[in-house]
């Protein structure tokens, strides 16, 4: 038995200079797992609660000492003596201890950090890599794949201070034969884009996730400049590389309208879907995330109707990694993919349940970071261990993003042909 003998919580810093929760789980025999909770910038209203102290005299109210105290007291007491390999049981103990719908008593940041640390400790106890342990927890032992990265190379919206409304413009190196090759392609495009921006006299500073944030006139301009960079890097757009968007539309949804302040345009629900379709008709956009507000279910039905057969429509704020909400989406034919973020739901077990539900319904699952990250690279192991097929973990700079890519390189080296890179076949509507 992988007996838990100690649980330790502490306050550490995330990539935006805000505090977050880190946890350690110690087992008999000296096995230790350590993990940290990430934090989002654009968040869905139905996400599990990230518990902050609210003490304005410390970190402007963003301290997490209360959540850390919950780890060191209530959670520790509840888990001492338990078996770390029994992940579902551990997570249920913490969920029951919290007793609220959205984990607002203990904090999803506290529960998640311990949940992931326990999984890492259990993997160490079993003498196997974390991705292998996750595959076993998922009921799919030995079934792996390397994910196609969605590389966020140009930022707008909440992730940048510019006139671009769409939050993320991403490249997907679908023409690569291996993850290592895909990463190289993305890096070459990233550096070429920097030169293109510099030569045009545009800013080459980067946003929270490492993408550039130039002040462009429109969203179409952002796509045009990425196209230029892809081709200058020696790749063919639409064959070697496809494009993906994260609109984060809830951030500019006001009074039932989609207000693109940067472009000076206002759309109704169907009008904004038509606008996105027009962009996808001009460029090889194969994936659109949060193309409408999380509450605009009628609009989502229309968007799925006009684009769902050819384009991956990803629900992030829409589904918040929550099986109850995803069930409603599946029943109503809303979207065809779910973004998976650990901290939206707050435990590894619930995260795996959302991935399984999506796959069983024919939806894809895209594993994702948050804008506030740490050096923790658990999502890399999650992507491989569930054979999710896609990962979204930022651009090709900032150590908090590159940590995940580097872990994927290590995993691919270990697994070789046991973890194929399937490229375009992983993306809904493209197989």
Curated annotation (Swiss-Prot):
It catalyses: (2R)-2-phosphoglycerate = phosphoenolpyruvate + H2O. GO terms for biological process: glycolytic process. Keywords: Cytoplasm, Glycolysis, Lyase, Magnesium, Metal-binding, Secreted. InterPro entries: Enolase (IPR000941), Enolase-like_C_sf (IPR036849), Enolase-like_N (IPR029017), Enolase_C (IPR020810), Enolase_CS (IPR020809), Enolase_N (IPR020811). Its cofactor is Mg(2+). The gene is eno. Transmembrane segments: none annotated. It is found in: Cytoplasm; Secreted; Cell surface. This is Enolase. PROSITE patterns: ENOLASE. One of its GO terms (molecular function) is magnesium ion binding. SUPFAM superfamilies: Enolase C-terminal domain-like, Enolase N-terminal domain-like. It comes from Shewanella baltica (strain OS155 / ATCC BAA-1091). Belongs to the enolase family. Binds a second Mg(2+) ion via substrate during catalysis. The keyword Ribosomal protein does not apply. The active site is at residues 209, 341. Gene3D superfamilies: Enolase-like C-terminal domain, Enolase-like, N-terminal domain. Catalyzes the reversible conversion of 2-phosphoglycerate (2-PG) into phosphoenolpyruvate (PEP). It is essential for the degradation of carbohydrates via glycolysis. Pathway: Carbohydrate degradation; glycolysis; pyruvate from D-glyceraldehyde 3-phosphate: step 4/5. (2R)-2-phosphoglycerate binds at residues 167, 341, 370-371, 392. PANTHER family: ENOLASE. Mg(2+) binds at residues 246, 289, 316.
